[in-house]
């Protein structure tokens, strides 16, 4: 069974070795550029010689792997001066550290010349930190802080990038109770106290418990070195006493200062007064307590006074505070805003500031541009005339009522006159019915445009009785009064009516002279025909 197993292993090894040899042969053939590179070589000449399998070799290989590698062993052939010069050259010129340089020298069997020649053939691993490098870095960091250029002066074989990388990895694993931290605290306390007495600093109980543990170890080593086992007991008791003294400040070592805090000063007279009698300290404390209570009362009283003043100040500030606009200025005109602007023009006329205040979200310039842009669309000129007429009416309200009454009475008289004036103008006998009807129809067509109200006002219904037509409302006469230059008592609608009746009489005379109809109507029917189209 063992032979079969060894045969299998040998075959597998043969395959692997043949593959390696074939690759190696192909590389050599490619280097030599033979023409038959793609040929497969078969035969015993092209096979590797495989040694027999020895199971004892595996254990020996394992033992070798578990052993540590020797880096350096001193030799009398190399002097200390030569060794220092070799290490300095390896560090400055090739970037080796001390351990790597000594390993190279041991590899060449303490031959300095061969080691110096072989240093340039290898590149040292830059991130490898020895214990010595770590201690030097902590010392440099305690002195210089994060000034990595100064730290590099203490570690010349390290690059700044390597120092920064190691700093962040060291910062994560850094503990508060390290030796360098304790040394930094001691230096800080020395700087703050500004004392030159080093013995007081060494006897200061403001150290950590780890420092005491290290002191225990050192004392134990000293006792073991001296061989006095019985001396361990009193040393432990002394250390426990020290621990009890420093237990109060173990987490806050900076509180164990000899000087009082800022703002407190020790005077000899006060100390003498306190030490004179036992009750003086209690009396002083009571006085300080009463003083503290009185000061607290004063603070509370001042707070109450401030709150009252603050409330009084807040009562009247709202009246003096300017009002913020509720609506933002918007240049777009909605339908509601347009209608509101038209009504505001009817109310305020061209007072654009008042119109802008009514709308709320428009400026005076926007209102004026609206008046110019929408003047024809909303007939703002007529609306403005109505406002002007209303202002004139409000200025002379009594006179306006009288003029309206006189105008209505004169309108009735003129209509009666129009009925009586038409027959005398006829040169021939009475006009025919057709002529009178055509004349009345033309007068009826010409009279309504003169008595129509403005476009924004509702016209009178055609089926209204004659009494309403003879007395128009004030809104219909107001725009017509503005057209007269001097506000004469007779309205302007009467004169065109008289002229039209004269023109109609002339037309009737011409028609009666040319017509050959024999039927003639009495004069009384002419006046009746004039009112008949208006009643319809």
Swiss-Prot record:
Residues 249-262 have a biased composition (Basic residues). This is REST corepressor 2. SMART domains: ELM2, SANT. Residues 1-44, 179-264, 389-536 are annotated as: Disordered. Residues 391-406 have a biased composition (Polar residues). Belongs to the CoREST family. One of its GO terms (cellular component) is histone deacetylase complex.
